[in-house]
């Protein structure tokens, strides 16, 4: 059986906004990541579509981490690194994995402190 893991960090960054996003309650203040099995409950997104297709194929699904928030300033380095590190740690714990489905927003920018 194919084992697939799913994750992503999705954010429309506006680099002209001076404040950076951290890990705070969802909304204009920052990210509130969804982790583990809760990721598998997400739908209505690219990630949800990938998971639905994988489920229809009979694959084993593992949720890692998914985070998104409203368009705003850059992602604080500490927030990005925390989410990245959790994705990597959860992926290591889930191994062996055959496929990783990732929903990342191409306009996401990290690089400031919150």
Tell where the protein language model's regions lie, with residue ranges:
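Low-complexity, highly charged intrinsically disordered N-terminal segments
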Residues: 52, 56-72, 78-79, 83-88
């Amino acid at each position: 059986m194919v084992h697939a893991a799913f994750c992503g960090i999705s954010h429309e960054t506006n680099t002209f906004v001076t404040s950076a996003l951290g890990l705070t309650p969802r909304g204009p203040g920052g990210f509130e990541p969804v982790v583990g099995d809760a990721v598998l409950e997400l739908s209505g997104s690219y990630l949800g579509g990938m998971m639905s297709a994988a489920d229809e194929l009979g694959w084993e699904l593992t949720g890692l981490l998914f985070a998104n928030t409203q368009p705003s300033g850059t992602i604080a380095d500490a927030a990005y690194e925390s989410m990245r590190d959790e994705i990597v740690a959860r992926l290591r714990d889930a191994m062996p994995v055959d496929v990783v489905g990732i929903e990342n927003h191409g306009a996401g920018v990290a690089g400031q402190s919150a």
